[in-house]
Amino acid sequence: MAKDLQVLTALDVAKTQLYHFTAIVIAGMGFFTDAYDLFCISLVTKLLGRIYYHHEGALKPGSLPPNVAAAVNGVAFCGTLAGQLFFGWLGDKLGRKKVYGMTLMLMVICSIASGLSFGHTPKSVMATLCFFRFWLGFGIGGDYPLSATIMSEYANKKTRGAFIAAVFAMQGFGILAGGMVAIIVSAAFKNQFPAPAYKDGALASTISQADFVWRIIVMFGAIPTALTYYWRMKMPETARYTALVAKNLKQATNDMSKVLQVEIEPEQEKVEEISQGNDFGLFTKQFLRRHGLHLLGTASTWFLLDIAFYSQNLFQKDIFSAIGWIPPAETMNALEEVYRIARAQTLIALCSTVPGYWFTVAFIDKIGRFAIQLMGFFFMTVFMFALAIPYTHWTHKDNRIGFVIMYSLTFFFANFGPNATTFVVPAEIFPARLRSTCHGISAAAGKAGAMVGAFGFLYAAQSTDPKKTDAGYPAGIGVRNSLIVLGCVNFLGMLFTLLVPESKGKSLEEMSRENEGEDENGTEMRASGRTVPV
């Protein structure tokens, strides 16, 4: 059976080597682009409003209408969700490596095309941008299940969690790169082409060269991704796919002998034994009996986490304005606004978002996925309620720094918590022939939650007083009530975490139970040791 295969045992016990770190960089570049893209578009939406939606004589600079802003920011989410489902399924059908190249090329081409969006009217430019951002998201979506699956199937038992989490943590570098590129490009153009503040010269405050600024920022994300294409194509197919799905033990042994630089026996006679009792499909009775609750656990926790995680971005504008990092829009020119927004968001990322990722990498194989996820949801719940219940206290000028610290801590415990573990666990607990598909389903549930968080709460967080809402938005339930709802969402995440098994220190075959067969009566032979914490 699978547990007897020397090639898989060799991978499980292999010492940490150069190929592990090479795999992290190659797989992580997709997440670098993912974070860069989602982050950089939020830096340039204000600029897009000034360029394409300027109204003569208006007291404030132009801004994207709510429906256009939602489309520009949200269309990539829709593409990502579709890509996660499609490429997740395709990765199990055709193999990880074949599909991996497709997703990367799609990301590179659509990143560049997004920056070349054209049209005679503002509406046509935004429509072209949205079209290419959907397909960019589609490619990024494919990277989620494939990168996680490839890293989990290459890693050893001892440090597998840290390696998969490190791939995901490349998002942190993508966020920082997005901020730094926006700062450098906007500063360079600002110095070269001085312009007055909006209140001193409405039309002159947005220079014609500003149109190049957002295009350069959007396109830059394609460069590091394109550089890894060669190495992606050089990676051999994972041994677990070749042996357990394609049933080609000889090829798997040859590939891993080169990678690990050790002699491994082919064991071709075990091919039939591998699949005995492990040929059930997705959503069959046997799948639901073995993995149904696990899939519910991974999908629901990712869904709930992303509602809370992506809705937190809604409060950034209030925070930045409150602490004076971003002055009123009319007191700045277009490029000054890009510079200020990029600087503020990069500082928040540097102080709270990025450290959280690497705390997970450091501790995931020491204290386990289950403990980190439960702890993360717990502290996110605590901090959300701590912000919500005395909300009027935090709005006073003297308490604003405290509000920023509390806000930063929710981001920290999202990343040193469920934001990382919801990505890691689905790559470890499902059978090889369904691993990529199940990870894609879990990730797609997460993106559905992201859409609820980013857009549902964009409307919900509006003031209950119609006179105080943002332009174009109806009255909502207010920020305080929104924070209370988000606290409840995080608490639900804690409860659904109880469905997620602990995979620390176990092989993929132990977790997926591919090292079990069926006896002559067709009943399952269960491996010793429970997987679900109680």
Swiss-Prot record:
Localization per Swiss-Prot or TrEMBL: Cell membrane
Per the UniProt record, which residue ranges are transmembrane?
24-44, 70-90, 99-119, 125-145, 164-184, 211-231, 291-311, 344-364, 370-390, 401-421, 441-461, 482-502
On the Extracellular side, which residues? 45-69, 120-124, 185-210, 312-343, 391-400, 462-481
An individual GO BP term: floral organ senescence
What are the alphabetically sorted keywords of the record? Cell membrane, Ethylene signaling pathway, Membrane, Phosphate transport, Symport, Transmembrane, Transmembrane helix, Transport
Q: What is its main location?
A: membrane
The reply to whether Ribosomal protein figures as a keyword in the UniProt entry is no
Q: Which Gene3D superfamilies match?
A: MFS general substrate transporter like domains
Spell out which residues lie on the membrane's Cytoplasmic side: 1-23, 91-98, 146-163, 232-290, 365-369, 422-440, 503-534
What does its record list under induction? By ethylene during corolla senescence.
**Chain segments annotated as coiled-coil in the UniProt record:** none
Pfam families recorded for this chain? Sugar_tr
Catalytic activity reads: phosphate(in) + H(+)(in) = phosphate(out) + H(+)(out)
Topology versus the membrane: Multi-pass membrane protein
GO cellular component term of the entry, any: plasma membrane
Q: From the UniProt entry, list the residue stretches annotated as the region Disordered.
A: 507-534
Supply the InterPro entries for this chain.
MFS_dom, MFS_sugar_transport-like, MFS_trans_sf, Phos_permease
Enumerate the GO terms in the molecular function aspect.
Answer: phosphate transmembrane transporter activity; symporter activity
Q: Which family is this protein grouped under?
A: Belongs to the major facilitator superfamily. Phosphate:H(+) symporter (TC 2.A.1.9) family.
Instruction: Give the NCBIfam families listed for this entry.
Output: 2A0109
Fill in the misc note.
Although related to the sugar transporter family, it does not transport sugars.
Describe its function: Low-affinity transporter for external inorganic phosphate (Pi). Involved in phosphorus (P) remobilization from dying to developing tissues during corolla senescence in an ethylene-dependent manner.
Name used for this protein in its record = Low affinity inorganic phosphate transporter 1
Could you tell me which species this protein originates from?
A: Petunia hybrida (Petunia)
As recorded in Swiss-Prot or TrEMBL, the protein's gene is named PT1
